[in-house]
Amino acid sequence: MSTTKLTRREQREHAQRFIDTLAGTAFPNSRRIYVHGSQADIRVPMREIELSPTLVGGDKDNPRYEANEPIPVYDTSGPYGDPDIGIDVRQGLAKLRQPWIDARNDCAPLSERSSAYTKARLADDGLDELRFSGLLTPKRAVAGKCVTQLHYARQGIVTPEMEFIAIRENMGRERIRSEVLRQQHAGEGFGARLPENITPEFVRDEVAAGRAIIPANINHPESEPMIIGRNFLVKVNANIGNSAVTSSIEEEVEKLVWSTRWGADTVMDLSTGRYIHETREWILRNSPVPIGTVPIYQALEKVNGIAENLTWEAFRDTLLEQAEQGVDYFTIHAGVLLRYVPMTAKRLTGIVSRGGSIMAKWCLSHHQENFLYQHFREICEICAAYDVSLSLGDGLRPGSIQDANDEAQFSELRTLGELTKIAWEYDVQVMIEGPGHVPMQMIRRNMTEELEHCHEAPFYTLGPLTTDIAPGYDHFTSGIGAAMIGWFGCAMLCYVTPKEHLGLPNKEDVKQGLITYKIAAHAADLAKGHPGAQIRDNAMSKARFEFRWEDQFNLALDPFTARAYHDETLPQESGKVAHFCSMCGPKFCSMKITQEVRDYAAKQNIEAGMADMSHHFRARGGEIYLKQEEA
């Protein structure tokens, strides 16, 4: 990792160059493929990793090879992962879902923006240089209609989004023919229902039951459909966002593209700086993944950062502003109730959630109940009109392992369960946010409590961090907890970067956090027994045993780091075909020795001889020691 510190100007110039030269880029020895659905415009992107053949015999002059089939993998990079697609962030991405949205004939363009704040920003000529030029005309459900994926699912309708997701979740494993690659250990799903083949009808059923959500605002047609639920692949969220003192619009767009390249299934824009509105527009128009926000952050900016001055009216205006821009899910801290705030007084670290602390301060200042709780039905009405999913925030999550699983945390969780049922009355999709800081032995209870009290709505957790002693390495401390809770049933994991508790992450931090959490999510998929999850592991192990170094690099989550580490000690091209690595050397490589043993056994027909001796042993009673007269 580079330790060179760039100035603010250099950072912005670097981001500008990145945007100016941005083009679709494939990973090493990979190509973009599309799996087609029942209609021409359902084209599901995947990345296919090409592998080299295996040497199976012959001699130096006439070697014999056996082909290794390519490995398809889930791909979140959208058009940025396709070298054949031209990229221009000033124009934004193609509107993939627009035909599907229009065909349902249940929404219409607005004649004007609903948000007073949006109108004021659009009228400000001084913002023209910052503004995204190709602004969409926002749509809203027509009177008497609901446009949510949950509503369609409950009506028995399988949408194109659901079919897209079913194809995507199967990860192209139907293309794999090798029995070696298809072998998989049985998992322990703790009640998860994992079918051998995910169908569009299964997707519809899970969404209808509230066990899964499809974050897909009708005003974000650029997004590629994805699903969050415990009966699907574990997903990973990346946080980006500027602040009052750091980062520019260019840098946030760069971080968005970078996040999708390294596997972010969703991205949360947590911007708190001056140009929140304009930054978000650039992000949405260029994002192939769902975008989430915490609207209270922007509402607070509108009252100059004074929590006591927040009002329902200002917050409502912010919801309308963001919904009409295309935000796919809102984190709403509606479970921080006035009566729960005193429960945090005896905590070691009190209230650590930014949104939770804002609402707690408002409640105490006015000695009134949380206005998000009081106006929750109105929030649901807004979400239903645009298909904004709700991520019910854990404002009272523990900020230290000492505070884990306490009265405040679980009281709020039960309230989130009550709010979930209210949201479902409006056909609004819901997921539940969770901790936080929790030692390993206390993690599973978080999952069981959530399933019981929140009616199996998808769980979305920050880690949890399993120890508090490792600032600078909290992507490790939390990755441990993330893998565990993902196995127990958590549907989406919010990444933690090395900068957690220390500062805002840069590009390299974002990558480190995402790789750590992709490992955690994949480990959880393996442990649950998600069909096909082990294919890539099997391909890697086969390549490793056969000393196919290039394939090992290319199958890795991070091919560049894998190659760089190998080349530190074996940089020559001959090192890429060597039947050993730098750790053991040529004479002590266990896999090389094993191959030699196999070759020797084959030549001497030892296996047949051993089988004959085994039969003879069993025929004599199977005893290791025999009396002399029996021998």
From Swiss-Prot:
One of its GO terms (molecular function) is 4 iron, 4 sulfur cluster binding. It comes from the Bacteria. GO terms for biological process: thiamine biosynthetic process; thiamine diphosphate biosynthetic process. Its EC number is 4.1.99.17. It catalyses: 5-amino-1-(5-phospho-beta-D-ribosyl)imidazole + S-adenosyl-L-methionine = 4-amino-2-methyl-5-(phosphooxymethyl)pyrimidine + CO + 5'-deoxyadenosine + formate + L-methionine + 3 H(+). Gene3D superfamilies: 6.10.250.620, Radical SAM ThiC family, central domain. Keywords: 4Fe-4S, Iron, Iron-sulfur, Lyase, Metal-binding, S-adenosyl-L-methionine, Thiamine biosynthesis, Zinc. [4Fe-4S] cluster binds at C581, C584, C589. It is an enzyme of class 4 (lyase). Zn(2+) binds at H437, H501. GO terms for cellular component: cytosol. Pathway: Cofactor biosynthesis; thiamine diphosphate biosynthesis. Its cofactor is [4Fe-4S] cluster. Homodimer. Belongs to the ThiC family. This is Phosphomethylpyrimidine synthase. It comes from Klebsiella pneumoniae (strain 342). The lineage of its organism: Bacteria, Pseudomonadati, Pseudomonadota, Gammaproteobacteria, Enterobacterales. The gene is thiC.
